[in-house]
Amino acid sequence: IVLFIQFGFAQKSSYSPYSYFGVGETNFSATADNKMMGGNTAYVDSVSVNLNVPASLSKLKFVNYSVGVNLKNNRYSTQDNNAKTTTASLNYLSVSIPTKRLGFNFGLKPNTSVGYLLESVDETTDPVSTNRYNGDGGINSAFLGIGFELFKNFGLGISSSYSFGNLNHYHSKILTDVELYTRVSSESSLSGLSYNFSAVFQQKFRNNIKIYSSYVYQPESSLTSKNSQSIRTLKLDGSFGGDTENINLSLTGMDETKFTIPSFSSFGLGFGLDKKWFVGLNFKSVQGNGYRNEFMSLDNVNFNQHNIYSVGGFYLPKFDSFTNFFDRVTYRAGFKY
C-alpha cells in the first residue's frame, strides 16, 4: 500500500491552466467500462464493480482486481496561441471481494490534479518584467466500501474515503538582465474524510428484459488544509540565491484553513437483456459554493451548481462463443455533457 500511495503522489496527470483554481482539475473517476458508457451508474452485474456506487458490491459474485490508466489529450487555444498537452496517469486501483452476506472493496484513486505554467510579459516597464505562475500537486483518496442486499433485487452500499495530498502554487517575478529574481511559494497539505451512500435496484420484466436503477448521494465534506508561505531569492538557473523569508501565517489565521468539497447526487436508469445489451442514462447534480479555500481564494472566481448528463450502453453478440473472438467482445459507447 505504501508503494501505491507514493505512486499516487508522484504522478502528474494534468497540464491545464484551469487546474490553477480550487483543488485542481477534477478527475473523471470511473472504471474503463463505465467510462465507455459515459459514466453510467445504473448497470450492475456479478463480475464487475462500479467504484462510484458501493451498492454494486451487493451483486458481486467473483473476486475483482481492477487497475486503470488514463491517457488524456487536451488542446487549448486563444486568439494568439495554441497548445496541446498529453498526460498519462493512474486512474484507479481496486480490489473487490464478495462474501456470503456482503461484498467489500478497497483501493486508491486520484481525485484532482494540479499542473500549469502561465506567463505574462510587461514590456512597458524598464527593465521588462515577466510574471510566471506555475503549480503542481493534487488530491488522492484511499477508499473502503461495502455493499449488501437488503431485499431481493435491492442493494445498499456505503464507502468511506480518506483524502490526502499537496497543492503547490508558485509566483515568480523576473526582470530582464537582472541576475536574481523572487519567488513566492504557497503550499498546502490537505487531508480529510468523506462518505458515499448508494442504492441499486433491478427488476426483470417480459422476455427477460431487466430494468436497472441506481441512486448515489455524497454529503458535503471538508478537508483540513495546513498552509505555509515563503519568499525566496533565486538565480536565473533556478538555484538558491541566498535569501529566504518564511511568512508567519498564524498572525492572520491562514496557517490552517478548511477546504469545502460540495455534495452531489446522482441517479441512473436503464434497461437491457442480461449478458446481451444495455442502454441507460444518468443525471448528476453537483452543488455550488465548494472548492473554496480562504488561503488561495480569488475574488472574481465562483464555483456554481452544475449538472452532468450522460447516455451509454453496450452490446455483446454472444458471450459464450467458442468459435468467434469478436462475438465475445463487448462493444460499448456513450457520451456525457
Residue ranges, per PLM feature:
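Subset of outer-membrane beta-barrel
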Residues: 11-337
